[in-house]
């Protein structure tokens, strides 16, 4: 068992002071960066950083978190086996984003006492003090437990993140707060036997309410069609969409080569 590291409330609060969020450009803008691509460590926990090849220290970049599934690790986000690298988002970003893949504790995101939220807070603080980030353009996505952690971020960090994309998620990393609006995309297989489809719908419905959207039923594809149906909720203060696809509990909906989740996620992020 990996020893539990308790992050103090001071750490979490120091990462997000009101003065930080009054500005758009991070304090790392204009600096010669010291953080390089590869593995970095904060208080015994690791994350992988990917900075664009054409990184410009004076240009504010999107910041995108890719969160792994249960039994996985940060390397699964970048190795291109179960999913396209970085959930297919790096190629679509075309050098406009900095990517982070944190490593979950004990191969997951139990988020005991908010420790995983505090870890992500600390990563943001470290990255943004060294690199040029648009602080109004932070995003998170993940599959399964990584989706649950993305949902947890939507609950407790809606004012710090612009949007999340939750792939086959559930309420498995907690939902501290959970009353603020945030742009929310859910993607879920209708035959998911691990985290049921209706649970994914319920996650989205929370932000339908938070964002003041008009209530609407979620469309579903015909079983066996290998298709998908997207529902865009109307009247929202921040967008909420849900994609139901003909599949199960899949890290890459409709297959690793499918553009469904990568295209939908990146376009949703950029339109949020």
Swiss-Prot record:
Task: Name the species this protein comes from.
Answer: Aspergillus fumigatus (strain ATCC MYA-4609 / CBS 101355 / FGSC A1100 / Af293) (Neosartorya fumigata)
Gene3D superfamilies cross-referenced by the UniProt entry: alpha/beta hydrolase
Q: Which domain of life is it from?
A: Eukaryota
To which protein family does this belong? Belongs to the faeC family.
Q: Which SUPFAM superfamilies match?
A: alpha/beta-Hydrolases (SSF53474)
What does the record give as EC number?
A: 3.1.1.73
Instruction: Tell me where it mainly resides.
Output: secreted
Give the UniProt keywords, A-Z.
Carbohydrate metabolism, Hydrolase, Polysaccharide degradation, Secreted, Serine esterase, Signal, Xylan degradation
InterPro entries tied to this protein: AB_hydrolase_fold, FaeB/C/D
| A molecular function GO annotation | feruloyl esterase activity
Q: Does the keyword Secreted apply?
A: yes
Q: Where in the cell is it found?
A: Secreted
A Gene Ontology cellular component where this protein is annotated is:
extracellular region
* Biological processes per GO annotation: xylan catabolic process
Which reaction(s) does its UniProt entry say it catalyses?
Answer: feruloyl-polysaccharide + H2O = ferulate + polysaccharide
Write down what this protein is called: Probable feruloyl esterase C
Q: Which PANTHER family match?
A: FERULOYL ESTERASE C, PTHR38050
Signal peptide (residue range): 1-22
Please describe what this protein does. Answer: Involved in degradation of plant cell walls. Hydrolyzes the feruloyl-arabinose ester bond in arabinoxylans, and the feruloyl-galactose ester bond in pectin. Active against paranitrophenyl-acetate, methyl ferulate and wheat arabinoxylan.
Query: What class does this enzyme belong to in the EC scheme?
Result: hydrolase
């Amino acid at each position: 068992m990996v020893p539990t590291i308790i992050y103090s409330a001071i750490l979490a609060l120091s990462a997000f002071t009101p003065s930080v969020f009054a500005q758009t450009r991070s304090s790392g803008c204009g600096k010669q960066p010291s953080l390089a691509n590869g593995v970095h460590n904060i208080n015994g926990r690791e994350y992988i950083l990917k900075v664009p090849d054409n990184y410009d220290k004076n240009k504010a970049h999107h910041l995108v978190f890719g969160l792994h599934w249960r039994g996985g690790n940060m390397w699964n986000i970048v190795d291109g086996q179960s999913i396209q690298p970085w959930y297919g988002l790096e190629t679509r970003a075309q050098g406009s984003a900095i990517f982070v893949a944190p490593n979950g504790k004990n191969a997951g995101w139990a988020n005991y006492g908010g420790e995983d939220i505090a870890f992500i807070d600390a990563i943001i603080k470290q990255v943004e003090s060294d690199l040029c980030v648009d602080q109004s353009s932070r995003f998170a996505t993940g599959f399964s437990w990584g989706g649950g952690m993305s949902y947890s971020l939507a609950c407790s960090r809606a004012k710090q993140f612009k949007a999340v994309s939750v792939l086959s998620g559930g309420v498995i990393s907690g939902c501290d707060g959970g009353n603020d609006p945030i742009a929310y995309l859910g993607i879920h297989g209708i035959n998911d036997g691990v985290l049921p489809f209706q649970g994914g719908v319920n996650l989205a419905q929370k932000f339908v309410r938070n964002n003041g959207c008009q209530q609407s039923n979620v469309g579903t594809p015909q079983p066996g069609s290998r298709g998908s149906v997207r529902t865009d909720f109307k009247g929202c203060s921040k967008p909420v969409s849900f994609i139901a696809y003909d599949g199960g509990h899949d890290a890459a909906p409709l297959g690793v080569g499918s553009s469904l989740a990568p295209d939908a996620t990146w376009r949703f992020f950029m339109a949020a």
